[in-house]
Amino acid sequence: MSITYAQLDHLNLSRLDHAITAWRAVVRKMREIDDSHGPKAQKPFEAAGWTTTGAGPDTAAMAHKQIKDAGHEADSALKQARAIEKVLTEARDSLKAQQKRLHDYVQETSAGGKVRISNQGTVTFTDSVADDPELQGQPGFGQAVAAEQRRIDEIEGEIRKILQTVTEVDDSAAAALRYNVGNDKHGFNEHATGSTEKAEDRYDAARAVQLAQKGEDMSNSELKEFNSLLKEHKKDPEFSERFATRMGGRGTLEFWEGMGLHDEPAPEGARKELLEQTRSQLGATIGTATQSDSKAMQDWKNDVIAAGPYALDHDLNKPRGFQVMSDLMNSGRYDSAFLKDYGNALISYEKDATKNGDSLSDEYLGKVIPGSGLDGGDIDLTNDWGTDPMAGYMNALGHNHEASTEFFSNKSNFDYAMGGEGVKGARDWPEDAYPQYDSGKSRGYDALGHALESATTGSDYGAAKPELHRGEDERAVMQRVMERYGNPEMELMDKQTGISDSMGRMGAAYIDDLNYSISGLDASDQRQRGMEELFGAKDENRIEPVTAQQFVRELGNDETSHGIMSQAQQAFTTSRIQAHEGTAEAYRAAEWGMTMHGALDEARAEQIGREYREGDEDYNHELAKSAAWKQAGVSVAVGGATTGVEAAATILAPQAAPFVIPIAEAAGTAVETGLGNEIADSLKESERDSTGKAINSIDGFDYEAKGLARTGIDNYMNSHGVEGPSRDARNTALDAAYARGGRITDTDNSR
């Protein structure tokens, strides 16, 4: 309950002072009892050497236990009394400080008599401009009234802040006292704590468990309270561990399965929305709990993994433990060791389940076996969940880049998850049967993409501030990705619907290496040609030129990855032009950027030609869309402050996940703000929508696409006053570079 202005203004703390004095006396008495128990009771008893002989009950042992228990109770009583006294003292001191803060503020504000504050905390002016009839209608009257109102809002806002602080102090103290007093009517609370914050956390954890025990019988208001508790404490290690261990591993799974989000029919309206929030907050809370290496949490982890292969409650129409746990793993950051153990168990289970030719779809969605019942009827083994646990697991890897890099560094894991034609033992990804929370689309390949992004960039997917850490392990995983997804025989990007955006962002993160590697297609010595300096790349990180060429072609084929890579290439080219400003290398960087754009656009045009007939409305529409990739903005994040983190520009794409591109720093110096502005200006100028234009030929596509691609160098030439024949010569060279790029990815001229 919120504390009112009048309550704080007139707060009398004398009763609280008396309570503190009384509890201090209790502490003294409990200390005397606790101190005297050992020397006056336990030690004399032990020294007496009393033993029991004969066949009767061991009276001596029973007495010894009672003496020991009494000592434990005395110790618990002292601990509880100290905790209560400390909580009361902290609360009294905080309330006194906030009351003084209020009185001082009111006195300062009311000085001069112009401002009046009522017992309800309402602020008025004693001589308000608004009440003066002579001023009404005069010039500036409206502005004066508005200024008064702003001052009133400011004062009332400060008072509300003070009252909010007091309410939080009161609530925290109440929760701490409830926890410290405990519910045991026959003993003392041995876990009592004098820390108000810690006691409140423990009370909240107990309350969350109490609500969870109601399961699906929780009302919407109780479910809202449960969600709020988890949201408040989801990053609190102690709360999370206490909640998880008191629920137990299997208990956690049974609770979430029983809440009914995936029931058929599915919940609707407010209940569905609340349950989706529960899934997110519970997953995040459990993720924090797994970071603990205590024995209790290790038992929890072992229980969850052990329950993974089996249907809950031995009911074959219920989901398997892996399905339930992985559903929660879509949110939160899980411990690396737990993810490794969980993933090994999940893959082992899947391989065992499919070794005789059964499919994962049947395993996770269930199936009906006709005519196999005892009465000759069908056996229905379907379950309402129908979710693929590997999808949730992949999202969990995506949120922990160390774990994802380790997972995909294992070739067996890589092959199993990625698959591809000719790859033995690869996983056959099933579609979710009931993806109520994802617009009816399978989440498997989308989640796989998130895990791969994390593994190759060294940054958690969805991080508030994406970073770029391309160490040896991350680069090795990216090399495998390029080889597998660039293989034209496998056509993985076409087959794995939902992964193309992740592939585009991964390509963007290695845009410097891709530029450098493709420059070596002519087998020339790239170092002698100065390509390292041109791109800010290192020869030691070079990808095989043909691998880079094939990967860029596959990225260019897809509309989504083509758009992301086009944005990334333009931003990267602009950064390299800026890095070489005032030298001939600036134009060389621009020409190479046009070459890369030409390669991407040729691949996209060919794919459109394969899918649509030239001249058809759909053909024209696809050309227009691909020629009109948009960009919302860019921010520059400078690496170097954190060991191993590279300088990178974070590209903020509209209605999509941001992506990062590498920017080389000269001698460790920070990227200049001007570089970020230059990239941002180039991207904003390319923000256009050509879908309304009649692009009905490949020439029209080339014209529009080239116009976007050259924005950075056009800005550069404008700022340097390059005009006339010199400008014409530069433009001719840029067009020629774009054409050369087209030849890099030209395969069958499906244009």
Model-derived features: positions:
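Gly/Ala-rich hydrophobic membrane-inserting helices
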Residues: L652-S682
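Intrinsic-disorder/low-complexity coil detector
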Residues: T21, G38, K43, D132, ...
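Short hydrophobic membrane-inserting alpha-helices and related fusion/pore-forming segments
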Residues: P57, V638-I663
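Non-catalytic all-alpha helical scaffold/repeat segments
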Residues: N183-E646, E665-E672, G676, S690-R740
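Compositionally biased amphipathic helical and low-complexity segments enriched in hydrophobic
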Residues: N12-S14, F535, A653, I661
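Alpha-helical rod/repeat scaffolding segments in eukaryotic adaptors/tethers
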Residues: G56, A60-A63, I67, A74, ...
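N-terminal secretion-targeting helices of virulence/extracellular proteins
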Residues: M1-G182, I744-R751
